[in-house]
Amino acid sequence: MAEMVARLASERAVVVFTKSGCCMCTAVTTLLGELAVSAAVHELDREPLGKEMERELARRLYGSGGRGGPAVPAVFIGGSLVGGTSKVMTVHLKGELVPMLKSAGALWL
């Protein structure tokens, strides 16, 4: 499963793993959309292996036990895990998100 998540996370400059109906997922994808980023979005509750992928994302976000909070949204930029909602919003408010997106080729501003 780790290889599958890594492959999906690297398919585009920005990849977001979400669940339909998740308000925090909507907040992150809306922010990226407002920045004119075309992210690949994978809704785990609509993926055949979504539960397994969610466990792998939780492991990546919170360590080997995979416990500590929600696994979605999980945002990857340039193939690297940035984090969930709080991390994405923090780097955005610090002015670091746009440079990350530019570096990954997701923005041309």
Curated annotation (Swiss-Prot):
Occurrences of domain Glutaredoxin (ranges): 2-108
Gene3D superfamilies linked to this entry: Glutaredoxin (3.40.30.10)
Motif Responsive for interaction with TGA factors: chain residues: 106-109
Keywords: Cytoplasm, Disulfide bond, Electron transport, Nucleus, Redox-active center, Transport
Location, primary (coarse class): cytoplasm
GO cellular component, one term: nucleus
Signal peptide: none
Subcellular compartments: Cytoplasm; Nucleus
Record's function text: Has a glutathione-disulfide oxidoreductase activity in the presence of NADPH and glutathione reductase. Reduces low molecular weight disulfides and proteins.
Name of protein: Putative glutaredoxin-C12
Organism this protein belongs to: Oryza sativa subsp. japonica
Lineage, top ranks: Eukaryota, Viridiplantae, Streptophyta, Embryophyta, Tracheophyta
